[in-house]
Regions:
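N-terminal small/polar loop signature for handling phosphorylated ligands or for N-terminal nucleophile
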Residues: 27-97, 197-211
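Generic secondary-structure signature for well-ordered alpha-helical cores
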Residues: 37-41, 66, 120, 140-144, ...
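A glycine/threonine-rich phosphate-anchoring loop and its flanking beta-alpha core
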Residues: 90-187
């Protein structure tokens, strides 16, 4: 349910503004109004976030009169909508509550935002001091969301365990990231156990145990891992660490350079192919074969061609990968050539796997 009854929300903050996606706010408006009924909270406006998580849209939100009047913000929708609201609240010191309307990523529960340039290409991570005060998940709304978005969310969350455990290797682990690593180990199995059924139930718009388990995995488990495995903008840079993602997301950031991929394929869809590339790079071939099977079972990609890329695109992907923060924490001595070879080998193995089915 979406019941806002905490002292944090009603006793201190009275005027609330909703910032989010147009469809997301339309779908959740009734539940939100029902949720605040009987409290002192007033929703003074519903403000569109601008269509992408960019600093330009954050500035537009800042200049909105309703946002300026509000005591707090409800961030509503998918990852880019929530990341925009989150960045605004972090920069301008507004309390934030999040309401994910799709189970496509963990943005609602994390203390960082993925920011993009106005042309849609990846710009940077924006790090915040804390996540939202509270995240509300309404499984009925999630069940009525597009099945394809949950599908992509499964692909994104599929990366969590493999990337975190890989990135933590050869590191001097202290308590907080060690705890994040432990939580990450609980990420993969719920997706494999409940993922296919959850997609079927989402297609039929039926809130079920499978949808609840997958939504919790995508939004909460992955979000908690992120919060425990990232420490950036520290006064002592030598104490910084970033173990939250690794080579699977490196594939995504490189792929975002290619419009035919970035515009036609979802974040988690691309990341799921990146998981296979990471497992190839790390020599985990038995586990890679298990994920080949899982990806095929729900239609996630096993080859470059399925995400509108070719072998000729791979050097540019690897070059971009070497420029992002994840590359710094790849264990061993990573090289662009080694990553190129891993991606190409994954594509070759994926083609052979699909040909045998």
């Amino acid at each position: 349910s979406t019941r806002v009854r905490s002292s944090a929300a009603s006793d201190v903050y009275k005027r609330q503004v909703a910032v989010g996606g147009k469809t997301a706010m339309e779908k959740s408006k009734k539940a939100l109004l029902e949720g605040i009924k009987g409290s002192d909270i007033e929703i003074i406006d519903f403000v569109w976030y601008g269509g992408d998580s960019s600093y330009e849209n954050v500035e537009k939100i800042k200049n909105n009169p309703s946002v300026q009047k509000a005591d707090m913000v409800f961030g509503i929708g998918g990852g880019r909508a929530v990341d925009t609201a989150k960045t605004y609240c972090a920069l301008y010191n507004k309390p934030l509550f999040t309401f994910p309307t799709i189970a496509s990523n963990c943005a609602s529960c994390t203390s960082l935002s993925v920011m993009y340039n106005p042309d849609g290409t990846f710009k940077e991570y924006s790090y915040h001091k804390a996540p939202a005060i509270h995240t509300f998940i309404n499984t009925k709304i999630i069940a009525e969301s597009p099945e394809k978005l949950m599908w992509a969310g499964i692909g994104d969350a599929l990366s969590k365990e493999y990337e975190v455990i890989f990135a933590c290797r050869e590191k001097n682990m202290i308590h907080t990231p060690l705890l994040g690593k432990a939580i990450a180990s609980a990420s993969t199995e719920p997706l494999i156990s409940f993922g296919k059924k959850a997609l079927e139930d989402c297609k039929n718009n039926v809130p079920t145990e499978a949808i609840e388990q997958v939504a919790l995995d995508i939004i909460i488990t992955a979000g908690l891992v992120s919060n425990f495995t990232v420490h950036e903008n520290n006064p002592n840079p030598e104490e910084d660490y970033y173990y939250n993602s690794s080579l699977a997301h490196c594939v995504y950031y490189g792929a975002s350079l290619f419009p035919q991929c970035e515009r036609q394929h979802l974040h988690g869809e691309i990341v799921s192919f990146g998981v296979l590339c990471l497992l190839t790079y790390d020599g985990q071939f038995e586990e890679r074969n298990r994920i080949f099977e899982f990806n095929r079972s729900i239609g996630l990609p096993c080859t470059l061609g399925e995400i509108a890329l070719t072998p000729d695109d791979v050097p540019a992907i690897a070059h971009k990968a070497a420029s992002v923060v994840e590359w710094k924490y790849v264990p061993g001595n990573p090289t662009e050539d080694a990553f190129i070879n891993a991606i190409l080998a994954t594509d070759k193995a994926g083609k052979e796997f699909l040909a045998d089915k």
